[in-house]
């Protein structure tokens, strides 16, 4: 599922970066195991950029890549992170996660697009046009 999502983002001509709350010691092997490393331009942990609940990681990518907030896209399963991004003008794509199922409606409400799974990415493709 996630691989299809990354391929869709790439096909739209986007640079793709992974930012996770997970530390590199666990994150990097997972990315390799899933076979998605060739689909991303970089991998960062919040320990490097700051929490997604704050402006810090978005400012990090803005300053490092020269991408204004309104040109960024956050794919996220946590409503607080989507809200923080939206407050800055970053578009959010909400995704379903079993561990966050009690927050599904908040995630759906806080996202420009909501993906209950990765089987149908047409709403995302429409957003990217």
PLM segments and residue spans:
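Asp-based, Mg2+/Mn2+-dependent phosphohydrolase catalytic module
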Residues: 24, 28-129
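Short, acidic loop-to-helix structural element flanking the phosphoryl-transfer center
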Residues: 1-18, 24, 28, 55
């Amino acid at each position: 599922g996630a691989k299809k999502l990354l391929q869709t983002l790439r096909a739209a001509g986007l640079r793709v970066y992974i930012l996770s709350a997970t530390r590199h010691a666990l994150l990097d092997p997972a990315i390799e195991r899933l076979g998605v490393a060739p689909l991303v331009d970089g991998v960062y942990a919040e320990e490097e950029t700051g929490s997604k609940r704050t402006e810090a990681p978005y400012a990090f990518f803005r300053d490092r890549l020269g991408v204004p907030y309104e040109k960024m896209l956050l794919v996220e399963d946590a409503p607080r992170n989507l809200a923080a991004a939206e407050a800055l003008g970053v578009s959010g794509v909400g995704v379903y996660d079993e561990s966050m199922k009690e927050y599904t409606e908040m995630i759906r409400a806080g996202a420009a697009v909501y993906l209950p799974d990765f089987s149908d990415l047409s709403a995302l493709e429409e957003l990217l046009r």
